[in-house]
């Protein structure tokens, strides 16, 4: 039976609010003005506003007023091997609000062969009963057939879902073949949906995991050793290539390495419609912790793709986030207790994957990118809120301070300093991967649906008051270019006369013949040069190898200072 929505859940009674003396910061401009809110919407913006009586006034005192944050990647109340993450939809959204995030987009993960629609309705029921901020849902495609196609189409047209994630990893569970990826991307492009991808080479990971265990490496360090960044980069390159062939917009989740960031950056410079999503963990910390002598600490960092062991990676990713090469940020918040993580104490492949970050996301970005001078305040709003709203067709209802937009606002103090601690955070997780980190920038007041949710460090939240926000297909921000390319990319056969020459008679050839050059015996001399089909000059930068007719000399790939060389390149 289809889930019918909320029943007898307390609703927020929206307050009439007036924010005075604030500096409004959108993604494209900043200016001083007052803001009047009523019935959960922004009604007036300007100076000397005429407002009705009974209005609660908040003095911003020149502080920034920004759109509420949108966390585009969460895993709240996620089932895993008979367990559930410790942060359910109430605890998780409570932590989100404490950090300045007023909307989340969670992932629905159906079991393999299970109904996508039934899983979606299960997540709706869980979330409607517990969230205290607004939310939307991505749906993960964990298998592919004609029945799934019908469900995907119904979710887009009837249920308010416009984004679906596929997996290139987790062999024999969720992993899809290249053919399936091609079919999924083609289908989603026709529906006006966004194809999200978890990019890792699952086949090689499975082999490397076995190799590590055979070597006796069973701890968390085995996780990152079996998933080198080349395997993330290769999958990103492959996903970009397949999405390009199908003219489908691509959204790469959990961008964790320099190599992957570079590939996305180069693809965008060549005009490919691809978006990259770093997460709180990859922006704020690194993978050196996998070698901690404290098993529980090392296990707390286990997530996939793994954090890079190169300690310069977070700074690099922040730089490309600031430059616009990466567009959105999520937290991939999936918290397990130490006892839950410990089911993999003797085998790293069994450690539940996930880190915290829903509460810390906005402060980490401010501290690492804005306070360091990499990013201005407008770009901060873009990557924490506005771009997400545009990509998922929520703009300008979300991600903007404008008349008619939802009154989801944050008064932000750029000078506030907060020391992260599991003792004071609002997550139920007993360990925080940012423990002891001193972060500049924090919310002073958080307003969601026109109601004050946090003030003076105190939360005022009610379970079950969050709303499901449907996302419609064909967002302009994503699909305007796709539509233009579809018109330009019509293929036509070459008009020519019928061939009336001789045709070779295949019936006269030996049926058991072996193609030349493929026998398994001793190597023989080639009378003419034969192209190695495994050596391709293809590049998304547009350069084709051997254009001059001269074979390229073999090259040795040398690791540059600071890290390994990429196995794939878009330049």
Swiss-Prot record:
GO CC list: cytoplasm; growth cone
Biased composition regions of type Polar residues, renumbered to the chain: 516-529
InterPro entries: Amidohydro-rel (IPR006680), Hydantoinase/dihydroPyrase (IPR011778), Metal-dep_hydrolase_composite (IPR011059), Metal_Hydrolase (IPR032466), Metallo-dep_Hydrolases_sf (IPR050378)
Keyword annotations from UniProtKB, A to Z: Cell projection, Cytoplasm
Disordered: region residues: 509-571
GO molecular function: hydrolase activity, acting on carbon-nitrogen (but not peptide) bonds
The keyword Plastid is assigned to this record: no
CDD domains: D-HYD (cd01314)
Record's subunit section: Homotetramer and heterotetramer.
Job description of the protein: Necessary for signaling by class 3 semaphorins and subsequent remodeling of the cytoskeleton. Plays a role in axon guidance, neuronal growth cone collapse and cell migration.
NCBIfam families: D-hydantoinase
Family as reported in the entry's similarity comment: Belongs to the metallo-dependent hydrolases superfamily. Hydantoinase/dihydropyrimidinase family.
Protein name in UniProt: Dihydropyrimidinase-related protein 3
Species per Swiss-Prot/TrEMBL record: Xenopus tropicalis (Western clawed frog)
